[in-house]
Regions:
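NAD(P)-dependent short-chain dehydrogenase/reductase
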Residues: 160-162, 166-200
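Alpha-helical substrate-binding/gating segment
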Residues: 184-192, 198-246
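Conserved Rossmann-fold NAD(P)-dependent oxidoreductase catalytic core, especially the SDR/UDP-sugar
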Residues: 92-139
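NAD(P)H-binding glycine-rich loop region in Rossmannoid oxidoreductase-like domains
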Residues: 42, 46-89
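Conserved beta-loop-beta element that borders a ligand/cofactor-binding pocket
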Residues: 113, 148-171
């Protein structure tokens, strides 16, 4: 059973799982969205269960008859006023999906976390066995809380497998590009990449999906893997975007501290602005202090190959233009 399959990472993960010969049951709130998302990748979406991850009984019914589960569904809210609801909804979802999967003896149980659960300022390199930290924003806090819960299941011996993707880019699922894809769209619109020590941590959605499919092997016990991808500093990022998009992109050495201040100010002003802005306090915290990612364990143990970020960015830009963005 898999949830979040109408989204970007979830849709590509479902395709990788199906391509590996597994049958997928889709947990969805609106089954009509399957046809406009993951089905566009050529995946059979006939087996689905209609449920919300916050509904314990309906989740359990969806889990019955399945051998394994991939859980990546989560409420994402950038408005600080929504933090409390996000924390409670996402924790309930983790308990209902991961917790009940453990009760039912499912193996493996894959939980898709985020590099933000491990992030802290001045961290040089991400690795899967770092202690839980999480950003200061609501989303980072939510990921950290669920991470603590999932690791508790691991400590008890449950076959929970946790992954930590970076900024996921690549071709869309229907019209879903994910948050990092929206970052590409914004950068191309502005023609400017600001920052001095800032960077993106780019991983291809197809490589993340391949990792999730590779984890669907029973009897391996609890495991954790980063899938951060490649750290691309501002000058290189501007060069790649400019070349693949055939446009002028400028790397502007704005002090990183100024970007963090701007993010905080725009968080406060956001509700009163007539437009959406990619600058948030949390986003600037991650962007200006982005670490490297040690993905060698998944490369060595699971045979995952992380493709050239230039190819990933090029595929993203091509697809954005194909949709008229």
């Amino acid at each position: 059973m898999q949830n979040a399959t109408t989204g970007f990472v979830g849709g590509w993960t479902a395709k990788a799982i199906a391509d590996a010969g597994h049958s997928v049951r889709f947990l969805v709130r609106n089954p009509a969205r399957l046809k406009t998302s993951v089905a566009k990748l050529g995946v059979d979406v006939s087996d689905f269960a209609v449920a919300d991850i916050s509904d314990r009984d309906s989740v359990r019914e969806a889990l019955n008859g399945c051998d394994a589960v991939v859980h990546s569904a989560a409420l994402v809210a950038t408005d600080p006023r929504e933090t409390s609801r996000m924390l409670s909804t996402n924790m309930a979802g983790a308990q209902n999906v991961l917790g009940q999967a453990v009760e039912l003896g499912m193996d493996p149980i894959v939980h898709v976390s985020s590099f933000t659960a491990l992030f802290r300022p001045n961290l040089a390199t991400l690795s899967a066995d770092l202690p839980v930290a999480g950003g200061t924003d609501g989303y980072g806090q939510s990921k950290a809380q669920i991470e603590i819960y999932a690791r508790g299941l691991q400590d008890a011996g449950a076959p929970v497998n946790i992954t930590y993707p970076g900024m996921v880019l690549g071709p869309p699922v229907g019209d879903q590009f994910g948050e990092a894809g929206e970052g590409v769209r914004s950068a191309l619109w502005m023609h400017v990449i600001p920052g001095r020590g800032a960077a993106w941590l780019i991983v291809d959605v197809r490589d993340v999906a391949a990792l999730h499919a590779a984890l669907l092997e029973s009897g391996r016990g609890p495991r954790r893997y980063t899938a951060g991808g490649h750290r691309i500093p501002v000058p290189e990022l501007a060069k790649i975007l400019g070349e693949v998009a055939g446009t002028t992109m400028l790397a502007v050495p704005v002090p990183d501290s100024a970007l963090r201040v701007a993010g905080s100010v725009l968080d406060q002003a956001g509700p009163y602005l007539p437009f959406n802005t990619p600058f948030t306090a949390a986003g600037m915290q991650y962007y200006t202090q982005m670490p490297e990612s040690d993905d060698s364990p998944s490369e060595k143990e699971l045979g995952i190959t992380y493709r050239d970020p230039r190819d990933t960015v090029a595929d993203t830009v091509t697809a954005l233009r194909g949709l008229g963005s």
